[in-house]
């Protein structure tokens, strides 16, 4: 079970990328995932690492992690979770 980068067929969520760009995150987020079998069920762990914003340098880099059943579902779940976290972290700045 090794961690891998986002596969080429999967593009980062446009809404997430545009939201990050709006708050000054110029480097793209890093996506890492792994798929494995757990009790005969396919599982997927995914992490999104978001770098520091140039517009709000007082906010530290952050990440989210989530677990799902297959990559496409886990990827959508992680993107939604990252958007919620983004809103929570930057609500005092926006």
Briefly describe each language-model feature range.
Residues 1-58, 69-72, 76, 80-94:
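N-terminal segment of the canonical double-stranded RNA-binding domain
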Residues 60-65:
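Short Trp-Ser/Thr-centered turn/loop motifs at beta-strand boundaries
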């Amino acid at each position: 079970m090794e961690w891998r980068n986002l596969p080429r067929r999967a593009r980062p969520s446009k809404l997430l990328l545009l939201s990050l760009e709006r708050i000054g995150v110029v480097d793209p987020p890093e996506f890492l995932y792994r798929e494995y079998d757990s009790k005969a069920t396919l599982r997927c762990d995914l992490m999104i690492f978001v770098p520091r914003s140039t517009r709000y340098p007082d906010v530290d880099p952050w990440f989210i992690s989530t677990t799902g059943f297959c990559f496409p579902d886990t990827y959508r779940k992680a993107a939604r979770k990252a958007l919620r976290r983004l809103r929570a972290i930057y609500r005092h700045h926006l």
